[in-house]
Design a protein with these regions (language model features):
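Catalytic-core regions of core metabolic enzymes
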Residues: 1-221
């Protein structure tokens, strides 16, 4: 409330202990979301590492491998994977436009960030790490529109039983059935990647190589 009184319009909550923990944490998270809605504040997080925007000279995250400016936007439910993507950006010199560690994504969801990236003139491709979905149908309907304007490269976590348990404890998100998710991704035009390194390489290609202007291209390897 004090922040809102000062004129703050958006807040990133890095603190954990919400839906990523227990029932009491879930209740606290719902109260946080309700307060943000009451005050008309954009809320990102909680339980995220922060945001980075090299084009605005902004690096506001807990772990901060500051990446060079580029055309790749990053959004992830895992802060560690954001750090990995930014480290690859530093190693390769292929930079990023924006980066968000969404955490529990209690109010502003992964799909909301992807929609904004699709309107961002500084972004040519979005790189996404996703552990689970609660609104699968909504995600599908919105992302298939986004991919018509912006390539999306996605790494899906929580595909094993151990990974599903880790996803639930890490971000408070339920991992989706892998076969269902694969079908959805294929229909929506998402480019799937098996791991972080491959995902960055694919995104780097989208960001640095122009797409063919027509279907008359033959590739020999």
């Amino acid at each position: 409330r004090r922040a809102s009184e000062k004129g703050v319009k958006a807040i990133f909550c890095a603190a954990g202990g919400y839906s990523d923990t227990d029932e009491a944490g879930l209740i606290a998270e719902k109260r946080l979301v309700a307060l943000a809605s009451e005050l008309d504040l954009v809320l990102a997080g909680p339980n995220g590492q922060g945001i980075v925007s090299p084009h605005a000279n902004l690096c506001a995250q807990i772990v901060a491998p500051y990446a060079p400016k580029g055309r790749i936007a990053v959004v992830s439910q895992s802060g560690n994977f954001v750090s990995s993507f930014l480290n690859y950006a530093n190693q390769t010199g292929i930079g990023i436009s924006r980066s968000v560690s969404a955490g529990n994504a209690a109010a502003t969801e992964i799909i909301d960030f992807l929609e904004w990236f699709s309107t961002d003139p500084a972004t040519d491709v979005a790189l996404c790490y996703l552990e689970g979905l609660e609104k699968g149908r909504d995600f599908f309907e919105r992302i298939k529109t986004i991919t018509k304007k912006l390539p999306i490269v996605l790494v899906k976590g929580g595909t094993t039983m151990g990974g599903q348990r880790a996803a639930a404890s890490h971000t408070g998100s339920l991992a989706s059935d892998s076969k269902i998710f694969e079908g959805m991704a294929r229909q929506a035009g998402i480019t799937r990647a098996p791991n972080i390194e491959s995902a960055f390489e694919i995104a780097a290609t989208f960001a640095t190589q122009p797409l063919p202007s027509g279907p008359r291209v033959l590739v020999l390897t």
